[in-house]
Structure formats: structure tokens, C-alpha cells
Design a protein with these regions (language model features):
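Soluble acyl-CoA-dependent acyltransferase catalytic core bearing the H(X)4D motif
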Residues: 1-5, 14, 23-428, 435
Length: 435
């Protein structure tokens, strides 16, 4: 199966400083042993056949890579155990787990890993790392429910008979298939394919143009974490709040759950900026909010079914009710203008970019990877000289992935917390995940 243009883009854009894997840290109660952890996964791998496939790059990148069965699949090369010294603190254990998440995934095997970190009294950290070319946030939560249970002692799923694993295609076969696919795609192109079919599509295309033009005509503030390209180091913190508190605010002031969440996040960012910026009045922050466009028939499928919206919100501190009103107004405008649908259509229109242009990215993750040198010698953060060049990108990402509203268990151990670790890349040095 060949990767879609959207999925392949996460491979093409990956660097040593900006790995493209989605990660979560599950904090489970008690000490989970590696043996029990391994057994739990071994009993369920047949439910996730895609996790036994690896990437096959096409010679000269004549087409997007393919997923092929890994004949040498070894579960022990995807599950790891780390024992921390006694008397380690929660934050120290979290910092260690985040450090484990920093390197790129090995492209010579299926693009996922799980690590358990023990040593913290009464708790075990479980780090899941899966490449973004395999999953998005919504499908990641669906897949997590395959490995996690709703009760402490479920009946293990019955494994079907083992099937023979197909040998992966050779380089010549991959090249020939790519040429044939390209010729077939060219023969199916019609002159009218690039033309909108109706007034609604024309309207969405015009709206998409406006969305992306606004990046230039309405530049965002340059936050301290936007002043340089990100390096390879990461740091994570998390905050736990009752969902009932969010619902209470929504009932009292109106709007949606997402509006309330974005209000809290953006006001927190504005207060952070007020401690680092001299002038904030009339300046705005641009937030990227991924939008799940996965339809009912695609639930449980891998790959990416995601669009995005880019709300522009005041960068100066406000009282909470005024902040919520500003968020509601912006989000209602975005919804009425169908920005998410417009961005999706624009992305689909650009999916025909010839993969050959991405051929140089095939060295990423190899001994010839130039991005490794860039990661070793990251650029310094640009000092605040009283003036910054216009920021024609985003300031940060805020994703709100609906989590499971009932207790989850891993190998009999109750999950206490889930901490999302988002991708950082380019000059976007901060992100926040709400689960």
C-alpha cells in the first residue's frame, strides 16, 4: 500500500531536530514489569497488522513510499525497559521519559516504539512513539483502545493462525511499480480536474486562498520561542483539571468546550508574553488547531484524516470573560466561513506534487543525514532588539483530542494520567495538547 501525499509529507519534512512522531506518556498505577508488558503486546499484535509493516522508499523517489511487511519483525526491538534510580521524583521521571522521545524513529523497521520507565514508587511511565505518517491524533486514540482495556482483567483476544509474511519488493520492482502508477495517473488526468465543479467549490477555493494570504497580510507576533529554529531538546509539563469545571464554564458563559479550552490556553500564553514582550497591544497570536475530518467509515483506519484552522487571537492579557468572547467570535467566523473544509480542499489540490522533488529527503535518518549536524549545532535564539521580522507562520499548536471518558487499564494496571507530546519543528518551539 502506497502512502498518501499527506502521510508521505510527514516523512519528507522530518529532520533530526524535528522528528515527526506522535507520542503519549501513560502514567499507570503500580510497577508494570517488562515481562508482563511484553506478553500483553504479544497477545494483541495480530489486531494491529499495520504495526508489522515498514517503509520501503522508491528509488529516486519516483513515487511516494510503500508500506511493506517486515519479514524480520521482532517485537523485542519495539518494546524497551528503563529502570530509574531509587528516590527519583515524578518530574525527574517525566524529564527522563521526554528525553527518550527526542530521537527520530529508526526507518529500517516499523515506525513505532513503546518504552516503560520504572523506579518511581507506585507508578510506571509508558511512552508510546508512533510516526505521524502512520497515524493522526484521532486514529492514535482509537488504536490506544486496542492495547488498553476498560477492565483490569479482560479475556485475552484469541489470535488467528499465523500467516506467511510476504517478502518485501526489491528496488527494481518498487521502481517499476512507481513508473506504472505515474503513467496511470497521468492517463487519468482530465483538463477539468483542476477546475471547481460548482459554485460551492469555487467559494471554498477562494476562502482557502484568503486563509493562507492572511499569513502574510496579518503577521502574528514573534514569541520568544519563535525566534530561532528548534533544536533537538524537549521539555514537557502537564496540568490536570476536572472536565466538569470546563463544562461549568461553558454552561455559564456559552460557547463550546473547545472555545473554553482555547480561552484558557490563549490567555495563559498572553500572560506569558506579557512577561517577555514590551508591547502587546493590537498584536495577535496565530494558533494552529488541527481538525479531525475522519468520517465514520474511516474510523479505525490508519493514516491522516486531518485539516486545520488558524484562529488569530489577542496577544495581550484580558479578563477571562472578554477572552472567551474574543475566542467565540473568532471561532464562529472560522466556522461560518468553513475554513477547515477550505484548507482540506486546498491540501487535496496540492497532493499531486511530484515526489521526485523530495528525493533528497531519503538520506534523513541515515549516516549521510545533514540534519544531524544541524541538530548538533543549533542556531542561537535571536535576541530581542526591539524589532522582530514579521512572523508569517504560526506561534504554536493547540490540539484538543477527545480522550476516553472511562478508566483504562494496561496489563491490569490502571491508567492515572495521559500526557500528549506534540511535534515541534521549524521555528515553532511550543505546543499544547488537551486530552
Amino acid at each position: 500500500m502506497r502512502l498518501s501525499a499527506t502521510d508521505a509529507a510527514f516523512l519528507y519534512s522530518e529532520t533530526a531536530s524535528g522528528p515527526m512522531h506522535i507520542s503519549s506518556v501513560f502514567v499507570v498505577e503500580g510497577e508494570l514489569t517488562y515481562e508482563r508488558f511484553f506478553q500483553h503486546f504479544a497477545q494483541r499484535m495480530h489486531l494491529l497488522p499495520a504495526y508489522k509493516r515498514k517503509i520501503a522508499m522508491v528509488p529516486f523517489n519516483m513515487s511516494h513510499p510503500k508500506w511493506v511487511d517486515d519479514p524480520d519483525f521482532d517485537l523485542s526491538k519495539h518494546l524497551y525497559h528503563h529502570e530509574l534510580p531509587a528516590e527519583v521524583s515524578f518530574q525527574e521521571a517525566l524529564n527522563f521519559t521526554v528525553d527518550l522521545n527526542e530521537p527520530m524513529l529508526d526507518r529500517s523497521k516499523p515506525l513505532w516504539e513503546n518504552h516503560i520507565v520504572t523506579g518511581l514508587p507506585g507508578l510506571t511511565f509508558v511512552l508510546n512513539r508512533t510516526h505521524h505518517c502512520m497515524i493522526d491524533g484521532a486514529s492514535g486514540m482509537e488504536l490506544a483502545q486496542v492495547m488498553y482495556d476498560f477492565e483490569p482483567d479482560p479475556t485475552p483476544p484469541e489470535a488467528p493462525p499465523q500467516k506467511d509474511v510476504e517478502q518485501p519488493p526489491g528496488q527494481l520492482q518498487l521502481y517499476n511499480e512507481a513508473v506504472q502508477d505515474n503513467l496511470r495517473a497521468l492517463s487519468e488526468i482530465r483538463p477539468t480536474d483542476w477546475m471547481p465543479e460548482n459554485a460551492k467549490q469555487r467559494e471554498l477555493i477562494q476562502r482557502a486562498s484568503k486563509v493562507f494570504t492572511d499569513f502574510v497580510t496579518r503577521p502574528a507576533i514573534t514569541a520568544p520561542f519563535n525566534r530561532s529554529m528548534v533544536g533537538p531538546k524537549r521539555r514537557a509539563d502537564f496540568l490536570r483539571r476536572s472536565f466538569s469545571e470546563i463544562r461549568e464554564v461553558r454552561r455559564a458563559f456559552g460557547g463550546t468546550i473547545n472555545d473554553v479550552v482555547l480561552t484558557v490556553v490563549s490567555e495563559g500564553m498572553a500572560r506569558y508574553l506579557s512577561n517577555h514582550e514590551q508591547k502587546l497591544e493590537n498584536k495577535h497570536m496565530r494558533v494552529m488547531c488541527p481538525v479531525n475530518v475522519r468520517t465514520e467509515d474511516l474510523k479505525g483506519a490508519l493514516g491522516n484524516q486531518v485539516s486545520a484552522i488558524f484562529p488569530m487571537l489577542p496577544a495581550w492579557p484580558m479578563d477571562p470573560s472578554s477572552r472567551l468572547a474574543a475566542v467565540r467570535t473568532e471561532m464562529e467566523n472560522i466556522k461560518s466561513n468553513e475554513d477547515a473544509q477550505a484548507v482540506t480542499m486546498a491540501s487535496e489540490a496540492g497532493s499531486g506534487i511530484w515526489p521526485l522533488a523530495m528525493a533528497p529527503t531519503q538520506v534523513v535518518g541515515t549516516s549521510l543525514d545533514p540534519t544531524v549536524w544541524a541538530a548538533r549545532f543549533p542556531l542561537p535564539v535571536m535576541p530581542d532588539l526591539g524589532w522582530q521580522p514579521p512572523n508569517v507562520g504560526i506561534n504554536f499548536v493547540c490540539t484538543n483530542v477527545p480522550g476516553v471518558q472511562v478508566p483504562l487499564y494496561l496489563a491490569g494496571h490502571k491508567v492515572r494520567d495521559t500526557i500528549g507530546l506534540l511535534i515541534l519543528c521549524g521555528n515553532v518551539g511550543f505546543s499544547t495538547t488537551v486530552l
